[in-house]
Design a protein with these regions (language model features):
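Alpha-helical structural segments
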Residues: 41-48, 83-98, 109-116, 143-150
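Hydrophobic alpha-helical connector segments
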Residues: 98-143, 159-162, 166-169
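Short, amphipathic alpha-helix enriched in basic
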Residues: 34-59, 90
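Hydrophobic alpha-helical bundle segments that form small-molecule/ligand-binding pockets
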Residues: 144-200, 225, 244-247
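Append "Primarily bacterial transcriptional regulators
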Residues: 62-65, 74
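HTH DNA-binding helix-turn interface
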Residues: 52-55, 68, 75-85
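Amphipathic alpha-helical segments used for helix-helix packing
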Residues: 89, 118-143, 147-149, 178-188, ...
Length: 262
């Protein structure tokens, strides 16, 4: 029977996995140094284009134009746009200094991870949208995942709970960044910064403040500090970490669930 991609074959040295040609990370290992340099150049150009004009501008044809080459030449290195995007994500995770190494105290470590991720998402506005489906499993991305998972396991020695900690942390960062990027896009689309927009809607807001149906809204608008995106991010992150800290006192969710159902 023919061996299917991903199966194993017997060799004189034992069992050897058969590489699937569809897994780009395995295919990269077979490239010559020259071909790898050319692929890195292609990926770097794609990242620059997406940073500058967004993912909607990224196509194989447009990228070929940017590189002053033929579209068919690009297909010698990548199978298509989806594979290119996977390479772009991993390249950004490596070139932007994603945190790696031994975990520090869990709270400091998770704070560092969150702030590094926020900076990366803001520098590459297309990036967060690529992390909401199947995860990229390139080497740079996996090093970052290893770092944050190790920190979560320092907090709570339970794989289920550690996985929930890491996913909750990244979901918070992505949600926070989405709001900030939406404001950037609104400014680009309307030509109004936040101050100018507030001046535009001021007459309507004043009428709302005088309406007895909205006392809580009026109190916040009139009395609350006008926090920056950075300050809002920091506040939310600290509250999330406070929640994680309770895991030390009450034990892991996963372990507790297993005890109740056993």
């Amino acid at each position: 029977m023919a061996i299917q991609p991903g199966e194993a074959r017997a060799t004189g040295a034992g069992v050897e996995p058969v590489a699937s040609p569809d897994v780009v990370w395995l295919r990269l290992e077979t490239l010559s140094p020259r071909a790898r340099r050319e692929l890195d150049r292609i990926v770097a150009a794609a990242v620059a284009l997406a940073d500058r004009e967004g993912l909607e501008a990224l196509s194989m044809r447009r990228l070929a134009t940017e590189l002053e080459t033929g579209t068919t030449t690009l297909y010698r290195y990548v199978t298509g746009r989806d594979e290119l995007l996977e390479l772009m994500v991993d390249a950004v995770n490596g070139s932007d200094g994603q945190v790696t190494g031994r975990p520090t105290a869990w709270r400091d470590g998770l704070t560092l991870v969150a702030r590094e991720a926020r900076a990366r998402f803001l520098a590459h506005p297309w990036l967060a949208s690529q992390l909401v489906a199947r995860p990229t499993i390139g080497p740079n991305t996996l090093l970052g995942a290893e770092f944050v998972i190790a920190i979560a396991l320092e907090l709570v020695d339970d794989p289920d709970t550690a996985a929930s900690v890491t996913s909750s942390l990244m979901a918070y960062v992505q949600g926070s960044v989405a709001a900030e990027l939406a404001e950037r896009e609104a400014q680009r689309r309307t030509g109004l910064d936040e101050h100018a927009w507030r001046e535009t809607v001021a007459p309507w807001v004043r009428s709302i403040l005088a309406d007895a149906r909205f006392p809580a809204f009026a109190r916040v608008v009139l009395a609350a500090d006008d926090l920056s995106f950075e300050e809002r991010f920091a506040f939310g992150l600290e509250r999330l970490l406070d929640g994680f800290a309770t895991l030390e006192a009450h034990g892991p969710r996963g372990a507790a669930t297993r005890k109740r159902t056993s």
